[in-house]
Regions:
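Arg/Lys-rich, positively charged N-terminal/basic patches that mediate binding to nucleic acids
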Residues: 1-36
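GIY-YIG nuclease signature motif recognition
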Residues: 11, 39, 73
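A short, surface-exposed loop/turn module that caps and links secondary-structure elements
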Residues: 40-65, 93
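Enriched for short, Lys/Arg-rich terminal
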Residues: 66-69, 74-99
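Short, glycine/charged-enriched secondary-structure capping and boundary segments
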Residues: 20, 61, 96-99
Length: 99
């Protein structure tokens, strides 16, 4: 059974900025729509098998690479919460590294 997918405020803001960047760069929302659809489809597959992702240094946080993006999330028996979405071409996020 697939988990319910939720987005944190941070990941929602990050996703909006990513989509706006591609809208401006391409002069059209077409690519952004396709990108969003592919990201959501990937998250739906991830919600079915969240352990098919990579563990982080924190036991409750995992990450997944999809279409050039790093998706950081946590999950429990009922939901998968997307914590962050960033371009894999950027510096890796250090927000979820156990200190």
């Amino acid at each position: 059974m697939a988990l319910t997918i939720e987005f944190s405020r941070r990941s929602t803001t990050q996703l909006q900025k990513i989509l706006e960047f591609y809208d401006e760069r391409n002069g059209s929302p077409d690519y952004s729509r396709r990108l969003l659809r592919c990201l959501l489809e990937g998250l739906q597959r991830l919600a079915q098998t969240p352990t098919a992702s990579s563990p982080s240094t924190r036991p409750d946080v995992r990450f997944f690479y999809l279409m050039g993006f790093t998706i950081i999330f946590r999950y429990n028996r009922k939901r998968l919460t997307v914590l962050s979405i960033s371009s894999s071409a950027r510096k890796p996020l250090k927000l979820y590294v156990k200190q």
